[in-house]
Protein backbone atom coordinates (compact mmCIF):
# COMPACT_ATOMS: atom_id res chain seq x y z
CA UNK A 1 0.00 0.00 0.00
CA UNK A 2 1.53 3.31 -1.09
CA UNK A 3 1.71 6.52 0.91
CA UNK A 4 -0.67 8.23 -1.51
CA UNK A 5 -3.34 5.59 -1.00
CA UNK A 6 -2.76 5.71 2.76
CA UNK A 7 -3.39 9.46 2.88
CA UNK A 8 -6.28 9.30 0.42
CA UNK A 9 -7.98 6.58 2.45
CA UNK A 10 -7.71 8.50 5.73
CA UNK A 11 -9.96 11.22 7.05
CA UNK A 12 -9.23 14.93 6.60
CA UNK A 13 -8.26 15.44 10.25
CA UNK A 14 -5.79 12.58 10.14
CA UNK A 15 -4.35 13.88 6.88
CA UNK A 16 -3.82 17.35 8.38
CA UNK A 17 -2.20 15.93 11.51
CA UNK A 18 0.13 13.64 9.56
CA UNK A 19 1.13 16.39 7.14
CA UNK A 20 1.73 18.91 9.93
CA UNK A 21 3.77 16.42 11.93
CA UNK A 22 5.90 15.54 8.91
CA UNK A 23 6.49 19.23 8.15
CA UNK A 24 7.53 19.98 11.73
CA UNK A 25 9.86 16.99 11.73
CA UNK A 26 11.53 18.18 8.52
CA UNK A 27 11.95 21.70 9.92
CA UNK A 28 13.48 20.32 13.13
CA UNK A 29 15.91 18.17 11.14
CA UNK A 30 16.96 21.17 9.03
CA UNK A 31 17.48 23.33 12.13
CA UNK A 32 19.45 20.63 14.02
CA UNK A 33 21.13 18.46 11.37
CA UNK A 34 23.96 17.18 13.60
CA UNK A 35 21.63 15.96 16.35
CA UNK A 36 19.35 14.33 13.78
CA UNK A 37 22.33 12.64 12.13
CA UNK A 38 23.70 11.32 15.44
CA UNK A 39 20.26 10.00 16.39
CA UNK A 40 19.82 8.27 13.04
CA UNK A 41 23.24 6.62 13.45
CA UNK A 42 22.18 5.40 16.89
CA UNK A 43 18.97 3.88 15.53
CA UNK A 44 20.85 2.37 12.59
CA UNK A 45 23.44 0.79 14.88
CA UNK A 46 20.81 -0.89 17.03
CA UNK A 47 18.97 -2.19 13.96
CA UNK A 48 22.02 -3.40 12.04
CA UNK A 49 23.98 -4.88 14.93
CA UNK A 50 21.15 -6.52 16.88
CA UNK A 51 17.77 -6.61 15.17
CA UNK A 52 18.79 -7.61 11.65
CA UNK A 53 21.00 -10.64 12.45
CA UNK A 54 18.75 -11.80 15.30
CA UNK A 55 15.44 -11.63 13.43
CA UNK A 56 16.32 -12.59 9.83
CA UNK A 57 16.62 -16.37 10.45
CA UNK A 58 13.27 -16.52 12.25
CA UNK A 59 11.45 -14.59 9.53
CA UNK A 60 12.84 -16.92 6.87
CA UNK A 61 12.20 -20.03 8.97
CA UNK A 62 8.56 -19.19 9.67
CA UNK A 63 7.81 -18.61 5.98
CA UNK A 64 9.56 -21.82 4.90
CA UNK A 65 7.77 -23.90 7.53
CA UNK A 66 4.45 -22.49 6.37
CA UNK A 67 5.24 -23.33 2.73
CA UNK A 68 6.30 -26.88 3.63
CA UNK A 69 3.05 -27.47 5.54
CA UNK A 70 4.64 -27.63 8.97
CA UNK A 71 2.21 -25.08 10.39
CA UNK A 72 -0.75 -27.12 9.17
CA UNK A 73 0.57 -30.28 10.83
CA UNK A 74 1.49 -28.35 13.96
CA UNK A 75 -2.01 -26.91 14.11
CA UNK A 76 -3.39 -30.40 14.60
CA UNK A 77 -1.25 -30.89 17.71
CA UNK A 78 -1.73 -27.41 19.14
CA UNK A 79 -5.47 -27.28 18.51
CA UNK A 80 -6.61 -28.12 22.08
CA UNK A 81 -4.20 -25.62 23.67
CA UNK A 82 -4.96 -22.75 21.31
CA UNK A 83 -8.73 -23.28 21.31
CA UNK A 84 -9.06 -23.86 25.07
CA UNK A 85 -6.84 -21.09 26.43
CA UNK A 86 -6.44 -18.61 23.55
CA UNK A 87 -9.64 -19.34 21.57
CA UNK A 88 -7.65 -19.51 18.34
CA UNK A 89 -6.96 -22.21 15.73
CA UNK A 90 -4.06 -24.52 16.47
CA UNK A 91 -2.07 -23.13 13.54
CA UNK A 92 -1.66 -19.89 15.49
CA UNK A 93 0.72 -21.71 17.83
CA UNK A 94 3.66 -21.37 15.45
CA UNK A 95 3.18 -17.60 15.21
CA UNK A 96 3.30 -17.33 19.00
CA UNK A 97 6.43 -19.49 19.22
CA UNK A 98 8.17 -17.55 16.43
CA UNK A 99 7.24 -14.26 18.08
CA UNK A 100 8.66 -15.40 21.40
CA UNK A 101 11.98 -16.47 19.86
CA UNK A 102 12.32 -13.95 17.02
CA UNK A 103 10.79 -10.81 18.48
CA UNK A 104 8.44 -8.33 16.85
CA UNK A 105 7.37 -8.04 14.10
CA UNK A 106 8.20 -11.71 13.37
CA UNK A 107 5.00 -12.89 15.08
CA UNK A 108 2.85 -10.41 13.15
CA UNK A 109 4.59 -11.40 9.92
CA UNK A 110 3.83 -15.08 10.57
CA UNK A 111 0.21 -14.22 11.39
CA UNK A 112 -0.14 -12.30 8.12
CA UNK A 113 1.28 -15.29 6.20
CA UNK A 114 -1.24 -17.59 7.86
CA UNK A 115 -4.06 -15.22 6.90
CA UNK A 116 -2.82 -14.97 3.31
CA UNK A 117 -2.76 -18.78 3.18
CA UNK A 118 -6.38 -18.76 4.49
CA UNK A 119 -5.47 -20.74 7.57
CA UNK A 120 -6.91 -18.05 9.85
CA UNK A 121 -9.30 -15.17 9.24
CA UNK A 122 -8.31 -11.52 8.99
CA UNK A 123 -9.68 -10.72 12.44
CA UNK A 124 -7.90 -13.71 13.93
CA UNK A 125 -4.67 -12.50 12.31
CA UNK A 126 -4.87 -9.29 14.33
CA UNK A 127 -5.48 -11.24 17.53
CA UNK A 128 -2.66 -13.67 16.76
CA UNK A 129 -0.36 -10.71 16.09
CA UNK A 130 -1.21 -9.34 19.53
CA UNK A 131 -0.60 -12.73 21.15
CA UNK A 132 2.73 -13.21 19.33
CA UNK A 133 4.13 -9.73 20.05
CA UNK A 134 7.28 -10.22 22.12
CA UNK A 135 10.63 -8.45 22.30
CA UNK A 136 13.65 -10.25 20.88
CA UNK A 137 15.14 -12.51 23.59
CA UNK A 138 18.71 -11.81 22.49
CA UNK A 139 18.05 -8.10 22.86
CA UNK A 140 16.68 -8.60 26.38
CA UNK A 141 19.62 -10.75 27.51
CA UNK A 142 22.54 -9.13 25.68
CA UNK A 143 21.54 -5.49 25.37
CA UNK A 144 19.36 -4.83 28.44
CA UNK A 145 20.78 -7.41 30.84
CA UNK A 146 24.48 -7.37 29.92
CA UNK A 147 25.09 -3.94 28.36
CA UNK A 148 22.60 -1.67 30.14
CA UNK A 149 22.30 -3.32 33.58
CA UNK A 150 25.67 -5.17 33.66
CA UNK A 151 23.81 -8.20 35.05
CA UNK A 152 23.08 -10.96 32.50
CA UNK A 153 20.99 -12.81 35.11
CA UNK A 154 18.68 -9.80 35.25
CA UNK A 155 18.19 -10.18 31.51
CA UNK A 156 17.10 -13.79 31.95
CA UNK A 157 14.73 -12.72 34.72
CA UNK A 158 13.19 -10.07 32.44
CA UNK A 159 12.88 -12.60 29.62
CA UNK A 160 10.99 -15.13 31.74
CA UNK A 161 8.70 -12.43 33.12
CA UNK A 162 8.17 -11.09 29.60
CA UNK A 163 7.09 -14.48 28.24
CA UNK A 164 4.88 -15.50 31.17
CA UNK A 165 3.15 -12.12 31.41
CA UNK A 166 2.56 -12.15 27.64
CA UNK A 167 0.68 -15.44 27.85
CA UNK A 168 -1.35 -14.22 30.82
CA UNK A 169 -2.21 -10.95 29.07
CA UNK A 170 -3.30 -12.83 25.94
CA UNK A 171 -5.58 -15.16 27.90
CA UNK A 172 -7.14 -12.17 29.67
CA UNK A 173 -7.48 -10.19 26.44
CA UNK A 174 -9.29 -12.86 24.45
CA UNK A 175 -11.83 -13.16 27.24
CA UNK A 176 -12.42 -9.45 27.59
CA UNK A 177 -12.72 -9.12 23.79
CA UNK A 178 -13.93 -12.51 22.48
CA UNK A 179 -12.50 -13.79 19.21
CA UNK A 180 -15.66 -15.31 17.84
CA UNK A 181 -18.32 -13.12 16.33
CA UNK A 182 -20.75 -13.28 13.46
CA UNK A 183 -18.02 -12.10 11.09
CA UNK A 184 -15.33 -14.44 12.40
CA UNK A 185 -15.04 -18.10 11.70
CA UNK A 186 -12.54 -20.77 12.61
CA UNK A 187 -10.83 -22.05 9.49
CA UNK A 188 -11.10 -25.84 9.29
CA UNK A 189 -8.76 -27.72 7.02
CA UNK A 190 -9.60 -30.76 4.94
CA UNK A 191 -7.74 -32.87 7.46
CA UNK A 192 -10.07 -31.66 10.21
CA UNK A 193 -13.09 -32.52 8.08
CA UNK A 194 -11.70 -35.98 7.40
CA UNK A 195 -11.13 -36.51 11.11
CA UNK A 196 -14.70 -35.43 11.88
CA UNK A 197 -16.04 -37.89 9.31
CA UNK A 198 -14.07 -40.74 10.85
CA UNK A 199 -15.17 -39.84 14.36
CA UNK A 200 -18.84 -39.64 13.35
CA UNK A 201 -18.92 -43.11 11.74
CA UNK A 202 -20.35 -45.54 14.35
CA UNK A 203 -19.37 -48.62 12.33
CA UNK A 204 -15.69 -47.89 12.87
CA UNK A 205 -15.99 -47.64 16.64
CA UNK A 206 -16.40 -51.33 17.46
CA UNK A 207 -14.07 -51.77 20.39
CA UNK A 208 -11.99 -49.78 22.81
CA UNK A 209 -8.65 -51.02 21.44
CA UNK A 210 -9.72 -50.40 17.86
CA UNK A 211 -10.88 -46.92 18.81
CA UNK A 212 -7.54 -46.08 20.43
CA UNK A 213 -5.51 -47.30 17.45
CA UNK A 214 -7.87 -45.53 15.06
CA UNK A 215 -7.41 -42.26 16.92
CA UNK A 216 -3.64 -42.64 16.73
CA UNK A 217 -3.77 -43.33 13.00
CA UNK A 218 -6.27 -40.56 12.40
CA UNK A 219 -4.08 -38.02 14.21
CA UNK A 220 -1.04 -38.94 12.14
CA UNK A 221 -3.02 -39.07 8.92
CA UNK A 222 -4.61 -35.74 9.77
CA UNK A 223 -1.18 -34.16 10.16
CA UNK A 224 0.14 -35.66 6.94
CA UNK A 225 -2.97 -34.68 5.00
CA UNK A 226 -2.75 -31.09 6.23
CA UNK A 227 0.94 -30.84 5.33
CA UNK A 228 0.43 -32.40 1.89
CA UNK A 229 -2.45 -30.08 1.05
CA UNK A 230 -0.35 -27.07 2.03
CA UNK A 231 2.57 -28.16 -0.15
CA UNK A 232 0.28 -28.75 -3.11
CA UNK A 233 -1.32 -25.32 -2.73
CA UNK A 234 2.06 -23.60 -2.48
CA UNK A 235 3.68 -25.40 -5.40
CA UNK A 236 7.07 -23.63 -5.21
CA UNK A 237 10.38 -25.41 -5.51
CA UNK A 238 13.05 -25.05 -2.87
CA UNK A 239 15.13 -22.58 -4.89
CA UNK A 240 12.25 -20.20 -5.56
CA UNK A 241 10.99 -20.59 -2.00
CA UNK A 242 14.41 -19.69 -0.58
CA UNK A 243 14.65 -16.62 -2.79
CA UNK A 244 11.14 -15.48 -1.89
CA UNK A 245 11.72 -15.91 1.84
CA UNK A 246 14.99 -13.95 1.74
CA UNK A 247 13.37 -11.14 -0.25
CA UNK A 248 10.29 -10.89 1.96
CA UNK A 249 12.27 -11.15 5.21
CA UNK A 250 14.71 -8.42 4.16
CA UNK A 251 11.81 -6.21 3.07
CA UNK A 252 10.17 -6.60 6.48
CA UNK A 253 13.44 -5.83 8.25
CA UNK A 254 14.04 -2.75 6.09
CA UNK A 255 10.63 -1.47 7.16
CA UNK A 256 11.54 -2.16 10.78
CA UNK A 257 14.85 -0.34 10.43
CA UNK A 258 13.16 2.67 8.88
CA UNK A 259 10.75 2.95 11.79
CA UNK A 260 13.55 2.65 14.33
CA UNK A 261 15.67 5.36 12.66
CA UNK A 262 12.73 7.77 12.36
CA UNK A 263 11.75 7.28 16.00
CA UNK A 264 15.36 7.68 17.14
CA UNK A 265 15.47 11.06 15.40
CA UNK A 266 12.02 11.94 16.75
CA UNK A 267 13.03 11.17 20.34
CA UNK A 268 16.24 13.19 20.04
CA UNK A 269 14.43 16.21 18.60
CA UNK A 270 11.74 16.07 21.27
CA UNK A 271 14.50 16.04 23.85
CA UNK A 272 16.04 19.17 22.33
CA UNK A 273 12.93 21.27 21.80
CA UNK A 274 10.25 19.99 24.19
CA UNK A 275 12.14 18.86 27.32
CA UNK A 276 15.62 20.39 27.04
CA UNK A 277 16.16 21.00 30.77
CA UNK A 278 14.40 17.96 32.23
CA UNK A 279 15.55 14.45 32.93
CA UNK A 280 14.54 12.21 30.04
CA UNK A 281 13.60 8.91 31.65
CA UNK A 282 10.06 7.75 31.07
CA UNK A 283 8.49 9.22 27.96
CA UNK A 284 10.96 7.72 25.40
CA UNK A 285 9.75 4.32 26.63
CA UNK A 286 6.30 5.15 25.28
CA UNK A 287 7.72 5.73 21.80
CA UNK A 288 10.57 3.29 21.12
CA UNK A 289 11.56 0.17 23.04
CA UNK A 290 15.34 0.16 22.66
CA UNK A 291 15.88 3.85 23.37
CA UNK A 292 13.33 3.75 26.18
CA UNK A 293 15.02 0.88 27.98
CA UNK A 294 18.38 2.63 27.63
CA UNK A 295 17.10 5.85 29.22
CA UNK A 296 15.43 3.87 32.01
CA UNK A 297 18.62 1.92 32.75
CA UNK A 298 20.50 5.21 33.24
CA UNK A 299 17.94 6.62 35.70
CA UNK A 300 18.62 6.74 39.48
CA UNK A 301 15.78 4.41 40.45
CA UNK A 302 15.70 1.67 43.05
CA UNK A 303 16.50 -1.79 41.60
CA UNK A 304 13.01 -3.19 42.15
CA UNK A 305 11.33 -0.19 40.53
CA UNK A 306 13.84 -0.15 37.67
CA UNK A 307 13.33 -3.84 36.85
CA UNK A 308 9.56 -3.51 37.14
CA UNK A 309 9.49 -0.51 34.80
CA UNK A 310 11.77 -2.27 32.32
CA UNK A 311 9.42 -5.26 32.34
CA UNK A 312 6.47 -2.94 31.75
CA UNK A 313 8.25 -1.20 28.87
CA UNK A 314 9.05 -4.57 27.29
CA UNK A 315 5.40 -5.53 27.58
CA UNK A 316 4.21 -2.27 26.02
CA UNK A 317 6.77 -2.39 23.20
CA UNK A 318 6.53 1.28 22.27
CA UNK A 319 4.47 3.15 19.71
CA UNK A 320 7.11 2.27 17.10
CA UNK A 321 6.37 -1.45 17.45
CA UNK A 322 2.62 -0.83 17.11
CA UNK A 323 3.22 1.00 13.84
CA UNK A 324 5.46 -1.81 12.63
CA UNK A 325 2.75 -4.40 13.26
CA UNK A 326 0.16 -2.17 11.61
CA UNK A 327 2.39 -1.84 8.54
CA UNK A 328 2.98 -5.61 8.37
CA UNK A 329 -0.73 -6.40 8.57
CA UNK A 330 -1.67 -3.68 6.10
CA UNK A 331 0.99 -4.78 3.60
CA UNK A 332 -0.67 -8.20 3.62
CA UNK A 333 -4.03 -6.63 2.77
CA UNK A 334 -5.43 -7.06 6.28
CA UNK A 335 -7.53 -4.42 8.00
CA UNK A 336 -5.99 -2.69 10.99
CA UNK A 337 -9.28 -2.11 12.82
CA UNK A 338 -8.08 -4.50 15.53
CA UNK A 339 -5.18 -2.22 16.52
CA UNK A 340 -7.21 -0.94 19.48
CA UNK A 341 -7.42 -4.52 20.70
CA UNK A 342 -3.68 -4.85 20.03
CA UNK A 343 -2.93 -1.75 22.11
CA UNK A 344 -5.18 -3.04 24.90
CA UNK A 345 -3.29 -6.34 25.05
CA UNK A 346 -0.01 -4.40 25.13
CA UNK A 347 -1.23 -2.38 28.11
CA UNK A 348 -2.35 -5.58 29.84
CA UNK A 349 1.05 -7.12 29.11
CA UNK A 350 2.80 -4.11 30.64
CA UNK A 351 0.58 -4.15 33.74
CA UNK A 352 0.98 -7.90 34.34
CA UNK A 353 4.76 -7.75 33.77
CA UNK A 354 5.10 -4.81 36.18
CA UNK A 355 3.12 -6.65 38.87
CA UNK A 356 5.05 -9.92 38.50
CA UNK A 357 8.42 -8.15 38.59
CA UNK A 358 7.39 -6.10 41.61
CA UNK A 359 6.52 -9.31 43.47
CA UNK A 360 9.38 -11.57 42.37
CA UNK A 361 12.41 -9.33 41.91
CA UNK A 362 13.29 -8.99 45.60
CA UNK A 363 13.25 -12.78 46.24
CA UNK A 364 15.17 -13.33 43.01
CA UNK A 365 17.81 -10.70 43.81
CA UNK A 366 18.16 -11.96 47.38
CA UNK A 367 18.97 -15.54 46.42
CA UNK A 368 20.68 -15.08 43.05
CA UNK A 369 23.98 -13.36 43.87
CA UNK A 370 25.78 -16.64 43.16
CA UNK A 371 23.85 -17.00 39.91
CA UNK A 372 24.99 -13.53 38.79
CA UNK A 373 28.61 -14.43 39.56
CA UNK A 374 28.32 -17.65 37.56
CA UNK A 375 26.77 -15.91 34.59
CA UNK A 376 29.38 -13.15 34.57
CA UNK A 377 32.24 -15.64 34.90
CA UNK A 378 31.16 -18.16 32.26
CA UNK A 379 29.85 -15.56 29.82
CA UNK A 380 32.47 -12.88 30.40
CA UNK A 381 34.53 -13.53 27.27
CA UNK A 382 31.57 -13.65 24.92
CA UNK A 383 29.81 -10.68 26.49
CA UNK A 384 32.89 -8.52 27.09
CA UNK A 385 32.01 -5.95 24.40
CA UNK A 386 28.59 -5.48 26.00
CA UNK A 387 29.76 -5.37 29.61
CA UNK A 388 32.31 -2.64 28.94
CA UNK A 389 29.97 -0.18 27.22
CA UNK A 390 26.49 1.13 27.81
CA UNK A 391 25.75 2.10 24.21
CA UNK A 392 26.02 0.22 20.94
CA UNK A 393 27.35 3.26 19.11
CA UNK A 394 31.05 2.93 18.40
CA UNK A 395 31.26 -0.76 19.26
CA UNK A 396 32.94 -3.25 16.97
CA UNK A 397 30.32 -4.54 14.56
CA UNK A 398 32.00 -7.92 14.07
CA UNK A 399 32.11 -8.54 17.84
CA UNK A 400 28.42 -7.71 18.23
CA UNK A 401 27.31 -9.83 15.28
CA UNK A 402 29.49 -12.70 16.54
CA UNK A 403 27.87 -12.45 19.97
CA UNK A 404 24.39 -12.36 18.47
CA UNK A 405 25.00 -15.28 16.14
CA UNK A 406 26.63 -17.27 18.94
CA UNK A 407 23.26 -17.13 20.66
CA UNK A 408 21.32 -18.25 17.58
CA UNK A 409 21.81 -22.02 18.17
CA UNK A 410 20.45 -21.53 21.68
CA UNK A 411 17.55 -19.54 20.23
CA UNK A 412 16.86 -22.34 17.75
CA UNK A 413 16.91 -24.91 20.53
CA UNK A 414 14.66 -22.59 22.51
CA UNK A 415 12.17 -22.52 19.64
CA UNK A 416 12.14 -26.33 19.54
CA UNK A 417 11.70 -26.50 23.32
CA UNK A 418 8.89 -23.96 23.19
CA UNK A 419 7.06 -26.00 20.57
CA UNK A 420 7.63 -29.15 22.64
CA UNK A 421 6.24 -27.49 25.77
CA UNK A 422 3.25 -26.11 23.84
CA UNK A 423 2.52 -29.54 22.33
CA UNK A 424 2.78 -31.12 25.79
CA UNK A 425 0.42 -28.53 27.24
CA UNK A 426 -1.93 -29.15 24.35
CA UNK A 427 -1.89 -32.88 25.11
CA UNK A 428 -2.61 -32.20 28.77
CA UNK A 429 -5.44 -29.88 27.80
CA UNK A 430 -6.89 -32.54 25.49
CA UNK A 431 -6.68 -35.16 28.26
CA UNK A 432 -8.20 -32.74 30.78
CA UNK A 433 -11.10 -31.94 28.46
CA UNK A 434 -11.86 -35.62 27.81
CA UNK A 435 -11.45 -36.57 31.46
CA UNK A 436 -13.79 -33.99 32.92
CA UNK A 437 -16.27 -33.68 30.07
CA UNK A 438 -17.66 -37.15 30.66
Summary of predicted features, one role per range:
Residues 50-55, 155-170, 413-420:
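Alpha-helical transmembrane segments
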Residues 85-149, 283-299, 306-333, 344:
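Alpha-helical membrane segments and immediately flanking helix-loop junctions
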Residues 129-132, 138-225, 264, 324, ...:
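Alpha-helical transmembrane segments of multi-pass small-molecule/ion transporters
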Residues 68-70, 242-318:
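Transmembrane helical segments that form the transport core of multi-pass membrane transport proteins
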Residues 14-27, 43-68, 220-232, 244-270:
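Core transmembrane alpha-helical segments of multi-pass membrane transporters/permeases
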